[in-house]
Regions:
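Radical SAM/AdoMet-radical enzyme domain recognition
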Residues: 1-91
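Short, electropositive alpha-helical surface patch
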Residues: 2, 68, 87-103, 124-128
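A generic structural motif
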Residues: 10, 67-73, 99-112
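Phenylalanine-focused residue identity feature
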Residues: 13-14, 43, 56, 94, ...
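Generic detector of well-ordered alpha-helical segments enriched in charged/polar residues
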Residues: 22, 84, 88-92, 118, ...
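Accessory C-terminal segments flanking Radical SAM cores
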Residues: 102-168
């Protein structure tokens, strides 16, 4: 299929067991993953322990898979809110690994963000999602944990067939 960039976006929490974390990184390397974005921020670390994620990052660095930290920023990276301050603190815990920090994502007011974080967004401002894409110009595909992708499911159909039959 000629897919040059095989990128994985992950929270890095596959196990608390170091041996399993090492196995996962080895499998990622063997599968051809050549770009990894590691989501580390205040939101992920509310429910995910940092130690196994940091060990995962150490293993990824050792494996030579190109990796960037990918934080989620509330409102903007520059906004001085408690979530962004915590995110900066979490990112600091990875400093010794010398992993570059990517642009990450901006949390915008929609869904649960609007429901639980509305106090951080200005009233009366029309926000739009920076992540909406043209359905006729697919440049990347994302798989849901259950295998859903575009108009099919990789558990039921070959990915090549799904891509060839895609009609927006």
């Amino acid at each position: 299929m000629g897919i040059e960039k095989k990128q994985l976006i992950t929270n890095g929490f596959f196990s608390k067991k170091r041996e399993r974390i090492e196995e996962v990184v080895t499998m990622l390397k063997k599968s051809g993953v050549n770009s990894l974005l590691l989501s580390v921020d205040a939101f992920h670390q509310e429910t995910i322990p940092l130690e196994p994620v940091k060990y995962f990052a150490e293993c990824v660095v050792k494996s030579k898979i190109p990796v960037k930290l990918s934080p989620a920023w509330l409102v903007s990276e520059e906004d001085n809110n408690p979530y962004n301050l915590k995110t900066k603190e979490v990112l600091g815990k990875f400093k010794d690994l010398h992993i570059p920090i990517g642009s990450g994502n901006i949390v915008f007011p929609s869904g649960n963000a609007l429901k639980y974080l509305s106090e951080y967004f200005e009233d009366g401002v029309a926000y739009s999602s920076p992540y909406e894409e043209d359905i006729f110009d697919v440049r990347a595909i994302s798989f849901s944990p259950n295998g859903d992708v575009l108009n099919g499911n990789i558990n039921n159909n070959d990915i090549q067939d799904i891509l060839e039959s895609y009609r927006p």
